[in-house]
Each structure stands twice: as structure tokens, then as C-alpha cells.
Regions:
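Gram-negative bacterial Sec-dependent N-terminal signal peptides
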Residues: 1-22
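Signal peptide-proximal N-terminal region
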Residues: 24-25, 49-71, 196-201
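Extracytoplasmic "Venus flytrap"
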Residues: 27-52, 74-81, 102-103, 177-186, ...
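Extracellular/periplasmic Venus flytrap/periplasmic-binding protein
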Residues: 82-85, 136-137, 145-253, 288-296
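Beta-alpha junction/loop-to-helix N-cap segments that form part of ligand/metal-binding clefts
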Residues: 27, 42-46, 61-138, 150, ...
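Solvent-exposed, acidic/polar segments of extracytosolic/periplasmic ligand-binding ectodomains
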Residues: 28, 348-410
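Extracellular/periplasmic periplasmic-binding protein-like sensory domains
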Residues: 144, 246-317, 326-331, 383-409
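Periplasmic-binding protein-like
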Residues: 90-104, 121-131, 173-178, 229-239, ...
Length: 410
């Protein structure tokens, strides 16, 4: 398995050669609408740093269009209503590129609002760049020409996760725990469907949804998991809802496996500590030991911010925008959106493609496991002495799932 992938710009350069530097020096404003406060605020703060860090890396000569990226975040307090107010404020200030990711309920509201705005305001169109919200509806029943997703959606992650789990013969009883909004509901739905198809002998012995970013003590949930006899937990929880969950598991003696999306995200590595070694897994488009240029950037990021870079979608957002703007020879959102469709290039995790039919990025995924950092996998998040080490790479075709999207194009 090849995990140390190098950045290769050749494919982007070939696609964009004639458009290179067509907008050289032009400033492109990007606004991210996500939480910076509250229990899930630390994740948003980390990602705000990430976008600012890579805005410098990918501005000017760092992208084939030669544009300058200017980035800021508006705190939406994880509220769809606050997000719509922030969207209006950004549009009124002339922003045409909106980023969001933390919370599919917010993403669905923004996608709908942006689509309606664009229909009513020709010439003032806005593009929605979704870096993390993984509800499959966003690229299926509720797909929009103006929405582009850079993370793998839940159907893709669960496809890869259960492909790995089906060969783990010690997994017999599974408990599914999630946040009570569209994301948690979809994780449970796809987990049950995929397990039934690939390992019908596995019993789903319990299922729970809890309020988003409100639970401070998960001990009662751990008690239910233990009482069910589950040897494995599947959860799409993120931020404090995952860090407090694994903390409660450690404190209350639960020794089963956890299959997660976000074990490497702010707060969870510290909550895990040296516990969970060999038992906590993460399915994602990256991990902490990708090698090559990514290692250099992560080291530089940690030196600058005393924090860990983990939202790799940030890099692909900048890569895709730069390539599409060069190809379109324009920063006009309509032309850029059309140029983004079907765009292929090599990123930190290999060749990726923005699928034209639904605007879902097709990409490799990795299963990694929590273990002690060593010479081969040295990066230690939150200075824990531990790391997420890759155990399986899934090529694009493995995790790719079909779409029902019937997209209306301009």
C-alpha cells in the first residue's frame, strides 16, 4: 500500500496551461460560515487557521490562475438561521465564494438559499464550497449545480468502513451512536444497510441519537452500550461529541472497538491519550502520516500555531479553485463552476475528480488506527505520543457510490 503520496501538479498544469495567470493579481474573497464558539467552536477555530495558512501557500504563484485568496470566517454558532444571516451579509459585501462544512443541517440550508439566490439574481451568482458536511442528500435528492463537496459523503465512508469491518471476524455485535440531526441519521441508515449486505451475521444490538453539542457526560450512553453486549461502536460524532464520548468510554471501562470518522479532530486525540490503542479506527480521506509535502506543511503548521492540521479539504478547495479559474480564464462563479465540473488532478491523497453528475469529489479513503507513534508513523496529534497509522487504503472505485442527482444547470 502506498501512503506517502507526492503532490503532482502536471495534470492541473496541462488542463490549465492556456489559462495560466489570466487573472494574475486579482483578489478572490472567500467566506467560511461555521462555528467559532460553543462546544464545537475549537474545531472551527482550527479550520479558520487552516484556511488562512493555505491562503498564503496557494495565492499568487501558488495557483495556476495567479489570483490572491482572501479568507475570513463568520461565526454561525452552529445555527442554520445565523448561517443564513451570515450568507446575506457576505453576499451584500460582494463575496461570491462561500465555504461551510461543520453541520449538514447548516449545509442543506445554505445550499437551498444559495440556489434560490442565484436563480433570482443572474450576474451575482454564488458558489458553495462544502469542505466537511457529509449528508448524502446534498449530492443526491437535494443536489445543486452551485454546491461542490470536497469530503467523502457518508455513503462513501460507510462503504469503505464496512468493507474493512467485514473481514474483522471478532466483530459480532455493533452499537450505532450518533448526533440527532441529518448526519447522525444517515450514518445509522447506511451502516445498517451495508452491514446487512456484507456481514449479515453481525447483530446491531443498539442504536441511539443524542442532542448535537449539548451532552457533557456520555456515561449513561456508555452504560447502555456495555449493557447491550456490543463489542464495536460505529459513530459519526465529531468535536466535543466524540471527545467526551471516548473520555466516558475510558473512564467507565468500555474496551470495545470504535469506528469513527473524526478521531483525529481537535480534542479527541487528547481525550483518547494512550487508551484505545488498536481499538479506535478512523475512516477518512487522509491521516496524520501522509508523507511528502503534506508532512512538511503539517510540521510548519504545528510550529506556527501549536495546533494540528487535519482538514485536508482546505487544500483541495484552493487547488480546485486555482485550476478552475485558470481553465475558465475568469473568476466569474458561473464560468468557474462549469470549469470545476469533471476536473481531475493529483492531490495529497492521489488522483481526485470532481464528478460532473453530482459535484461529489471522488477520492481515495484510508482506514487508520490509534496506536503509539513510532519511526514509521511519527506524527503525534495534541502531543499525545500516539498517532493514527494507516492500515488500509481504498481506491476511488471502492468507496464511490452512485448518485440520483438530477442537476439543473444554468
Amino acid at each position: 500500500m502506498k501512503f506517502g503520496l507526492k503532490f503532482v501538479a502536471a495534470s492541473v498544469a496541462l488542463v490549465c496551461a492556456q489559462g495560466a495567470f489570466a487573472q494574475s493579481g486579482e483578489t478572490v474573497k472567500l467566506v467560511r460560515i461555521d462555528p467559532l464558539t460553543g462546544l464545537l467552536g475549537p474545531v472551527g477555530v482550527n479550520q479558520d487557521k487552516s484556511y488562512k495558512f493555505f491562503a498564503e501557500k496557494f495565492s499568487g504563484a501558488g495557483n495556476p490562475a495567479g489570483v490572491k485568496f482572501e479568507f475570513t470566517t463568520i461565526d454561525n454558532k452552529l445555527s442554520p438561521t445565523e448561517s443564513l444571516n451570515a450568507l446575506k451579509a457576505a453576499i451584500d459585501q460582494g463575496v461570491r465564494y462561500i465555504i461551510q462544512g461543520n453541520g449538514s443541517s447548516v449545509a442543506l440550508a445554505l445550499s437551498d438559499a444559495i440556489t434560490k439566490h442565484n436563480e433570482r439574481n443572474p450576474g451575482k451568482e454564488v458558489i458553495f464550497l462544502n469542505d466537511s458536511a457529509v449528508d448524502p442528500d446534498l449530492t443526491n435528492s437535494k443536489c445543486s449545480f452551485w454546491h461542490f463537496r470536497f469530503d467523502a459523503d457518508t455513503s462513501m465512508k460507510i462503504e469503505a468502513m464496512t468493507t474493512f469491518m467485514k473481514d474483522q471476524k471478532d466483530i459480532q455485535k455493533v452499537y450505532i451512536l450518533g448526533q440527532n440531526y441529518s448526519h447522525g441519521v444517515q450514518v445509522a441508515k447506511f451502516a445498517k444497510e451495508n452491514l446487512a449486505r456484507k456481514r449479515p451475521d453481525i447483530q446491531v444490538v443498539g442504536e441511539d441519537l443524542h442532542p448535537l453539542a449539548q451532552v457533557r457526560d456520555f456515561a449513561p450512553y456508555i452504560a447502555k452500550i456495555k449493557a447491550s453486549g456490543a463489542d464495536t461502536v460505529i459513530t459519526g460524532n465529531w468535536g466535543s461529541d466524540l471527545s467526551l464520548l471516548v473520555k466516558a468510554a475510558n473512564e467507565n471501562g468500555y474496551t470495545g472497538k470504535f469506528f469513527t470518522y473524526y478521531a483525529g479532530v481537535t480534542g479527541t486525540p487528547a481525550a483518547l491519550g494512550t487508551n484505545g490503542a488498536g481499538r479506535v479506527y478512523q475512516i477518512a480521506y487522509n491521516h496524520y502520516n501522509m508523507g511528502g509535502q503534506m508532512d512538511k506543511w503539517m510540521t510548519e503548521f504545528k510550529t506556527k500555531y501549536n495546533d494540528d492540521f487535519y482538514t485536508g479539504s482546505v487544500i483541495r478547495v484552493y487547488q480546485t479553485l486555482g485550476a478552475a479559474m485558470a481553465k475558465a480564464k475568469s473568476t466569474d462563479p458561473v464560468k468557474v463552476a462549469l470549469a470545476m465540473e469533471g476536473l481531475k488532478f493529483n492531490s495529497f491523497n492521489g488522483e481526485v475528480e470532481m464528478r460532473k453528475t453530482d459535484h461529489q469529489l471522488q477520492q481515495p479513503l484510508y482506514m487508520s488506527v490509534w496506536q503509539k507513534a513510532d519511526k514509521k508513523y511519527p506524527y503525534s496529534p495534541e502531543n499525545t505520543g500516539m498517532t493514527l497509522a494507516p492500515v488500509k487504503e481504498f481506491a476511488n472505485y471502492v468507496s464511490s457510490t452512485p448518485t440520483s442527482c438530477q442537476m439543473k444547470r444554468p
